[in-house]
Amino acid sequence: MRLKRWEIALLASLLAALLVCAFPLQVQSKLADKLTRLHVLANSDSEEDQALKLQVRDAVLAASAGQSVLDDTLLNKLEQAAQAEVLRRGYRYPVAVTRETCYFDTRVYETFSLPAGYYDAVRVVIGAGAGRNWWCVIYPPLCAGMCERDWETVAREAGLTEAEIGLICEAEGYVLRFQLVDWWGKLLHKLREI
């Protein structure tokens, strides 16, 4: 059976699209293996619970400062710090700190952005965990206010390659690639939910 010209053109276009998508997807996957994100969920969307979420975030970031190994001992330390902050602020909400693989949409921070995808995450759930959330990168320590040095230096020391650093900090050149990664990531995320 012989293919028609339009069929050949269609197949060539599909192959080209797959190749264009492959590089950013590969870089995102390798990047995700080197980062641990922090995900803090408030009890509710009330003004008080949202303020508490940020106070708990600060306590967790302070407790994680200088740590390079994310093990059960550190998770327990983070949970104790979060629970102590909740109690100190006069609330009786339970706090759960877990390590999970979570799907994150593309996120733009002050000095860099991360493509959508699955990342290792430390999840801090305050009370019902039904409120708006907050996230950043806990390892390497790239959260605003957490990193006292140039974040690119910290990223290099954590093992990120120049291509990975370029992917997350060159916003203009990677907008299309992030959209492709987002589209592909959302499709895979929806397929996993089925």
Outline where the language-model segments fall.
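Aromatic-capped interface at the extracytoplasmic side
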Residues: V20-K34
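Sec-exported extracytoplasmic/periplasmic mature domains
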Residues: R57-A65, Q83-Y91, A144
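Soluble extracytoplasmic domains of inner/organellar membrane proteins
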Residues: F112-L176
